[in-house]
Amino acid sequence: MANYVGVDLGATNVRAVAADGNGTLLGTAAADTPRGPTGIGVTEAVLGVVRGACAEAGIDPESVAAAGIGAIGPLDLAEGAVENPANLPDTIDRIPLTGPLSVLLDTDRVYLHNDTNAGVIGERFYSERNPDDMVYLTISSGIGAGVCVDG
């Protein structure tokens, strides 16, 4: 059975989970989001929690079939990076994500979304209710909203 990784990159914390194809949680890891000196430190923290979640799950990172990242913005989706995040120090101008994670996991199936939009997708397609219409709010280090209308 395939294994998957999910990453939550916020201004305060970075978290990762490893799960199997049934959605059974196999491992978790978390760390504080580095405050600098550059975005590479944040990238390394993401890779570290992914390694930690895989280790707790007892799986090799290279056995992961795909990964999803929900991250603070703004995002450069074409390059798979966070660009000049407002909630982090000015010295952090770019946080590369999909490229380094693709190398660690040995897969091109690494997907990046804004964290709030990822929440909307999760609630719409994977919650018990599967609501066609909703507003999803995040209130943390920043404030965000996602809307789903007519599915």
Label each PLM-derived region with a short phrase.
Residues 2-3, 134:
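Short, basic/aromatic recognition patches
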Residues 3-48, 81-84:
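Short glycine-rich, Thr/Ser-proximal phosphate-binding strand/loop in the N-terminal lobe
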Residues 8-10, 136-139:
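Short loop/turn motifs at secondary-structure junctions and domain boundaries
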Residues 14-18, 143-148:
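Short beta-strand scaffold segments in enzyme catalytic cores
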Residues 34, 43-47, 63-67, 74-135:
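Glycine-rich phosphate-binding loop and adjoining helix at the ATP-binding site
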Residues 46-53, 57:
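Alpha-helical scaffold within the catalytic cores of cyclic-nucleotide enzymes
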Residues 72-75, 140-142:
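Short glycine-rich anion-binding loops that position phosphate/pyrophosphate groups of nucleotides
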